[in-house]
C-alpha cells in the first residue's frame, strides 16, 4: 500500500511523523492499523485528496493544530 504513515502519541500531546516509512516498522509500534480509543499509540494512513488536504485512513480530516471537537474528541496536529 502506497502512502504516508504516521505514528502519533496523543497522550503526551506530541506527534511524530514518519514519512514513507515501512509499514512493518509501524506495525510493531501500534496494536491496530487505525485510531485506537484507549491505546497509547495510534497509527494512521495519510493520503492526500484532490484538494491537497490530508486525511486519515478512516477519512477523517487531519488538522494542523490541536482542537477540541464538539463531542470532546481531540484532533491531532499533523503537518506533512
Q: What are the roles of these predicted feature ranges?
A:
Residues 9, 18, 45-48:
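Residue-level signal for short segments within beta-strands and strand-turn junctions
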Residues 1-2, 31, 53:
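Intrinsic low-complexity, intrinsically disordered segments enriched in polar/basic residues
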Residues 18-42:
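A short, charged, amphipathic alpha-helix used as a generic interaction element across diverse proteins
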Residues 3, 17-18, 27-29, 69-80:
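Structural boundary micro-motifs
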Residues 12, 28-31, 61:
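Intrinsic disorder/low-complexity segments in short proteins, especially the signal peptide
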Residues 1-13:
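Short aromatic-glycine-(Arg/Gly/Cys) micro-motifs in beta-strand/loop hairpins
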Amino acid at each position: 500500500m502506497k502512502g504516508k504513515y504516521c505514528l502519533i502519541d496523543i497522550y503526551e500531546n506530541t506527534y511524530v511523523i514518519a514519512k514513507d516509512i515501512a509499514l512493518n516498522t509501524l506495525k510493531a509500534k501500534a496494536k491496530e492499523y487505525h485510531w485506537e480509543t484507549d491505546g497509547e499509540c495510534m497509527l494512521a494512513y495519510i493520503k492526500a485528496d484532490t484538494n491537497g488536504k490530508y486525511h486519515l485512513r478512516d477519512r477523517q480530516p487531519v488538522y494542523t493544530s490541536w482542537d477540541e471537537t464538539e463531542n470532546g474528541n481531540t484532533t491531532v496536529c499533523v503537518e506533512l
